[in-house]
Amino acid sequence: ATRHVLCDLSSFNPRRIPAATIGWFSPECTHHSSARGKKRQEQFGPDLFGETLPSEAAERSRATMWDVPRFTEAHRYQAVIVENVFEVLQWVMFDAWLLAMTSMGYRYRIVSLNAMHAWAQGPAVGQSRDRVFIVFWKAGNRAPDLDGMLAPPAWCERCGQMVAGEQAWKPGRSAGRYRAQYLYQCRVCHDVVEPVVLPASSFLDLTNTGTLIGERTRPLKPRTMERIRAGI
């Protein structure tokens, strides 16, 4: 069974959670800095819905990253996986956060992967989502085999066959987004290859044609109407 806890995570006692071998964390990512010393909301303005968190709320959002070492200290996991957006690597406190984890005897590797290329455990996702995974393991333990997770199937024109793609980083890069910072290449001839991806139709119900706004029986929310007017 899965236990769900609705709480203020910053004040939650991690020892109330049962011990586990692996800790998986996906800290809130909306308000991480996109450039050192500049807050994301201040740099880019309001979000898609015209909303901007107060600076105190944005700081609390970024502070969820610190719950990772807090829970890890309590449970001493054999391995820890932290999933987040690429911008977390540019967070001004990222190096200090890494130090907190390595001080507890963990080694780590930062992995960049787009969800549309995540074929290792089954079908990938039919949408492009760049993510970073910071994978920790206890020093002395065998490092996890992560390369197998980064080998999506791809067609190599020169070799004339399907191959397992290999990440090829642009000069000076070791983490980042697909195409912007890295590509995939054939392991044999080293030509650039394009991994297999699923179309959006793979997860869309094309028989559901939806409802026209004019045919709705319930009125739209005031905020929705404001956005429609702004768009018109």
Set out the residue ranges of the language-model regions.
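Conserved active-site and SAM-binding loop architecture
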Residues: 1-232
